[in-house]
Design a protein with these regions (language model features):
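Accessory, non-catalytic peripheral segments of nucleic-acid enzymes
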Residues: 203-336
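His/Asp/Glu-rich metal-coordinating catalytic cores
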Residues: 11, 28, 41-174
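A conserved active-site cap/scaffold subdomain adjacent to cofactor or substrate pockets
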Residues: 161, 165-216
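Divalent metal-coordination and catalytic microenvironments
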Residues: 19, 38, 82, 129, ...
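A short helix->loop->beta-strand "cap" motif at the edges of active sites that frequently abuts
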Residues: 26-33
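Generic beta-sheet signal
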Residues: 33, 124-128, 245-247
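Short, small-residue-biased leader/transition segments that mark boundaries at the very start
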Residues: 1-5
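Histidine-anchored nucleotide/phosphate-binding helix
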Residues: 19-26
Length: 336
């Protein structure tokens, strides 16, 4: 359910080779594979060779040109239809159906799904890549201001199972059968407390779906460690720990330890980040933490800024004008 690649990668050669090896291993075992492009992917690049790959039962979503066509599979319970829906923006949907009232991401997804209702007599699986309202995010992910890119989980009600990509934490949204698989590894320290897993879904007769998960344990975990320099360099404390893990260490010493990073790396070679938590740093952080960006609308952000600059709130007319500008700018960005 993607992302297949991460946009920030400067050299994707290794990633491309790894994907090639992985798909080949699955195809050699006669296992069908379904893949879509995400918001960090180039849909055109992911779709390259899609028609040829189908001969090996590797099904890749084409560039979005309209409602997805179901890919039928058959087993002892009958037909199972798989729908591949790559990452969508409202402008992409307006281009296909210009007469449809599509302004938001929710409108866009609702429009597409109206044009591909699943056969109620068949079991159906949707593979998609969108942010579903109510799902938990972390710092590794791009979060839009005001949650403007979110979609409602109820749009998926007609499908027996929905396999979602986009968010890094494995989780269900709305119901057990609408799930983000999450990432196989932790990509930032905001994910340190997440438990990565693989999700196994078995679709029996129509309406019967069983889900089990298996933990994914990496060779080196990503962890946060806290304590004084003396505590963290005490052999009795670290002797039985995984010192080769990727670590974010927070020292609680009131005085900075000279050359602490290099000295700690003698014990913890994969130390990636070092911070202090003491009276000095807490005083530096007395500014009240802002609310999460996705809980505040663009107009609320601008209104707060205007209040700070002018010592008075926006008038109703000013607020209405600002909201109109925001909507026009957002629409222009989607059409770009």
């Amino acid at each position: 359910a993607s992302d297949v690649y991460k946009r920030q990668l400067k050299d994707r050669t290794e990633a491309v080779r790894l994907l090639d090896w992985f798909l080949t291993q699955l195809a050699e075992r006669q296992l069908p594979v379904f893949a879509i492009s995400g918001n960090h992917d180039s849909a055109d690049r992911i779709a390259f060779g899609a028609a040829l790959l189908q001969n090996s039962r590797v099904y890749v979503s084409p560039v979005f040109t309209g409602a997805p066509v179901p890919i039928p599979l058959t087993d002892e319970y009958g037909t199972l239809d798989v729908y591949l829906l790559p990452f969508l923006k409202p402008a992409m949907v307006r281009h296909v159906w210009p007469d449809e009232p599509v302004e938001t991401y929710n409108d866009a997804l609702a429009c597409v799904l109206r044009h591909c209702p699943p056969d109620p007599a068949h079991r159906s699986v949707l593979v998609a890549h969108q942010f579903v309202a109510g799902a938990a995010c972390c710092e590794s992910e791009e979060v839009s201001v005001g949650g403007v890119d979110s979609v409602d989980a109820s749009l998926f009600d007609a499908f027996d199972y929905v396999a979602l990509g986009h968010l890094h934490s494995p989780q269900k949204v709305g119901r057990d059968t609408v799930r983000y698989c999450g990432t196989p590894l932790k990509y930032s320290f905001s994910e340190a407390r997440q438990h990565k897993s693989a999700c196994f879904v078995e679709l029996g007769p129509k309406g019967e779906v069983s889900i089990t998960t298996a933990p994914l344990t990496p060779k080196h975990d990503l962890r946060e460690v806290r304590g004084s320099y003396m505590e963290l360099t005490d052999r009795r404390r670290y002797a039985d720990t995984a010192v080769d893990d990727y670590l974010h260490i927070t020292l609680t010493d009131e005085q900075d330890v000279p050359d602490a990073l290099a000295r700690l790396r003698v014990i913890y070679p994969n130390l990636m980040r070092l911070d202090y938590d003491n009276l000095r740093t807490r005083e530096d952080q007395q500014i009240t933490a802002p609310e999460r960006a996705e809980s505040i609308t663009p107009l609320e952000h601008f209104s707060a800024f205007y209040q700070l600059q002018n010592n008075q709130p926006l008038t109703a007319a000013q607020a209405a004008f600002c909201q109109q500008l925001i909507e026009e700018i957002w629409k222009e960005g989607e059409d770009a």
